[in-house]
From Swiss-Prot:
It comes from the Eukaryota. This is Photosystem II protein D1. Chlorophyll a PD1 binds at residue 198. Photosystem II (PSII) is a light-driven water:plastoquinone oxidoreductase that uses light energy to abstract electrons from H(2)O, generating O(2) and a proton gradient subsequently used for ATP formation. It consists of a core antenna complex that captures photons, and an electron transfer chain that converts photonic excitation into a charge separation. The D1/D2 (PsbA/PsbD) reaction center heterodimer binds P680, the primary electron donor of PSII as well as several subsequent electron acceptors. It comes from Thalassiosira pseudonana (Marine diatom). The gene is psbA. Its EC number is 1.10.3.9. Pheophytin a binds at residue 126. 2 of the reaction center chlorophylls (ChlD1 and ChlD2) are entirely coordinated by water. Herbicides such as atrazine, BNT, diuron or ioxynil bind in the Q(B) binding site and block subsequent electron transfer. It catalyses: 2 a plastoquinone + 4 hnu + 2 H2O = 2 a plastoquinol + O2. PSII is composed of 1 copy each of membrane proteins PsbA, PsbB, PsbC, PsbD, PsbE, PsbF, PsbH, PsbI, PsbJ, PsbK, PsbL, PsbM, PsbT, PsbX, PsbY, PsbZ, Psb30/Ycf12, at least 3 peripheral proteins of the oxygen-evolving complex and a large number of cofactors. It forms dimeric complexes. The keyword Zinc does not apply. Tyr-161 forms a radical intermediate that is referred to as redox-active TyrZ, YZ or Y-Z. GO terms for molecular function: chlorophyll binding; electron transporter, transferring electrons within the cyclic electron transport pathway of photosynthesis activity; iron ion binding; oxidoreductase activity, acting on diphenols and related substances as donors, oxygen as acceptor.
Amino acid sequence: MIATLERREGVSLWERFCAWITSTENRLYIGWFGCLMFPTLLTATSCFIIAFIAAPPVDIDGIREPVAGSLLYGNNIISGAVIPSSNAIGMHFYPIWEAASVDEWLYNGGPYQLIVLHFLLGVASYMGREWELSYRLGMRPWIFVAFSAPVAAASAVFLVYPIGQGSFSDGMPLGISGTFNFMLVFQAEHNILMHPFHMAGVAGVFGGSLFSAMHGSLVTSSLIRETTENESTNYGYKFGQEEETYNIVAAHGYFGRLIFQYASFNNSRALHFFLALWPVLGIWLTAMGISTMAFNLNGFNFNQSVVDSQGRVINTWADIINRADLGMEVMHERNAHNFPLDLASGDVLPVAFTAPAVNA
C-alpha cells in the first residue's frame, strides 16, 4: 500500500472570511448584502429609538416654531414621532458634521435624515440579501421581487416625495399620528383618493387580504385528517412530508360551485403565483402614484364639472371632497403661509365697479 502525502495549501484569512460570509450553513445567513444591511439597520433603529424617546423639538417649517415629537417632551406612543428635517434645510444633505453643533443638528431635525437614509439602504440591502440567499440555495428569485414592492413604497414616501416637493420636511414623519397627518395633507395637496394608481393600490391591499383569507380558510377546511377527533388536525402534518396536506380537488369543487367554475384555480402553482402577484402589483402602482404626485401630477379633478342650464354648479361628491381638501389645506402649517396656494389660484374678483371720487 502506497500513501501519498501532499502539502496542504494554506487558506488565507480573507478566503475564510468570504466562505463564512457566503455560507448557507450559518444559523443566520449574512451574505455580502448583509455586510451593508446589518450596520445600516442597526444604526437606523438605534437612532430612531433614541430620537423617539428624547429628541428635542424640531423647527420643521423653518419659521422658528419648533414641534415636539419625543416622549420626554410630552408625547405618548400615539402622538410621538421623529419629526422630519427643517424646511430651512430643504433637500441639502445634513449629516452631523455639517452642523455648527449637535444642538443645531437636533433643532433642524438631523436625526430624521440619518434614520431615513440608513433605513432605505438597509431595506434595499435586505432585498438584495433575499436574492443572494435564493441564488445560493438554487431557488427562484420571486421572494426578492415581491419584497421590492414595500421597498418601492418606503422609497416613495421617504425619498422620492421629498425630492419632488423640494424638502425633507415634506417626508412622512416617523410616528403614528405623524403618518395620519402625512396622509391628510397628501390628500389636501394632491387629491390622492382620485388617483387611479392609488385606487389600484387599495384593490391590491384589500384584495390581497381577501384572497389570503379565502385561500387559508379553503385549505384549512379541506385538510386531510390524519388524527383522531380528540386531537388537533395540526398534529397530522409532518414537516417535509411528501403527501398533500389538503385536498385541492375538494377545495376546487367547493369554490367552483360557490362562485362559478372558472373562478377557482385547478393549478396550485398558478394559484400561489396569483396570490403573490396581486398585492405586489397594487403596491407597485401605489408607489408609482406617490412618485408621480411628488412632482404634482395629481389625482383627477372633477370639481364643478356638473352645471345646470343657467350655468349654476350642481355639487357632486368631487366638490364635497374638494371642500374637505381646502379645509385640510388651510389648517396644516397654518403659520407657514398666510394665503394658501389653492385658495389664491382662483379668478380675480372685482371688489368695486367704480373708483370713489377723490376731492382735492
